[in-house]
Each structure stands twice: as C-alpha cells, then as structure tokens.
Amino acid sequence: MNTQSNTYTFLYAAIMVVVVAAVLSFTSLSLKPRQNMNKEIEKKQNILKAVNVASTPANAVELYDKYIVKALIVNVEGETTSNDKSETFKVDLKKENKKDLAVRKLPVFVFNKEGVGEKLIIPVRGKGMWGPIWGFISMESDRKTIFGATFDHQGETPGLGAEIANAEFLAPFTGKQIFDQAGVFTSLKLVKGTASTNPHAFDAVSGGTVTSKGLEAMLQDNLSSYEKFLKSSK
C-alpha cells in the first residue's frame, strides 16, 4: 500500500485510535480495584476519625474491624432492616438521599472500645458552596449528645468553606446536643459568635457562610431521618 496515500493515512489513524482506546480501557480496568480499595480505606479512616481513633492507610482496615463491632441499616421508622456489616458499609448516601425518605437506607455504625464505651456513628451528606460536603457524626450512649464529628468536601474554598474539615472547627461539636430537654429534635443551628453557650448550635466558618449554611442543612436533613431510631435506642 502506498504509505503516502489518503487511504493509508486514514487506516493508520483508525488503527491508532483503536489501539489507544484499548490501552486506556485496559489501564482503567486494571486500576479500578486499587481505586476502590483506596476509597474503602479512606471511608474507614473517616468513620474512625469521628470517634477520635487515629489511623493510617496501613492500619485503617484492622482498626475498623476491631472497633466497629456492628453495623446496621435502619429506616425512617427506626426499624432495623439489615445487620450485615458489609452491606451497611456499601450504602451510597449520594444515591439514598435522592430516594423518598420512606424507602431510604440509613446506615449506622456501632463503635465500641474499652475505656471509651459504645458510640453510634451516623454518616451525613449535603451540599456546600461549590460541591458536595459529607462526614460522620458519632453519638454518646444517651443518643442525643455528640461525641465527635468529621467533615470533608469536594471543592470548598481553602481558608474559607474548606475550614469545615479542620480540627479547630470540629472540636466544638463535641458535647453539642441534637435533642432538647423535652426530647424534641433540634439538630444543630448555625449561629455567629454565640454557639459556645448554646448546646444546640455551632459557629459559622469565618468567610464561609454559604458552606456553613450547607452544613446546617446537611445535619438537619440527615440526622432528622434517624430521630425515631435514636429515641428507640435510648
């Protein structure tokens, strides 16, 4: 075949497209198991972080298996629909939050460590200023007091909304309460400068008002779904 012809050029280009596509597809398939494993490890690290257990990618799985003694899926009525630990871990909040509340799967992770006691860990997911925000809230044995919290984000502004992931912002959540003395669900409300004296409120991130409001909505929308479960567990 004449290598200078248009036909040759077309065939050569077509073959190269097929070859490159095949290589990229193979690479993607080869990397996917590792990418999935990394996501699993990161999620387990974040669950542990909500109960103040420090972990690394190397020991996160071991610590998760040791301290997360049980995992449940409950519904909005507070009923347990599954106690399969693996199934609970795989629940995708992004998908679940798009469903009607009546059919939504609500994951609960049960932590227990000698000297610390049992805590419930609840995942949360919502919207920040520039993209999704998410995290985990751990509850004391009274099922109304927050033991710990961890939040993360996809694209909030560094130094502003991104501060929701920093330890300084997270620390004041410990001891906050999502039910009042009468047992009415309050969640946590966004305030400016007075949250330290209010057990049902948190301070906004300086310069990150939109992200803070998104966090407030995330806590309200997600934690309210667990109201009956938390009350039945007391």
At which residue positions do the language-model features occur?
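Flexible, solvent-exposed loop/hinge segments and secondary-structure transition points
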Residues: 2-234
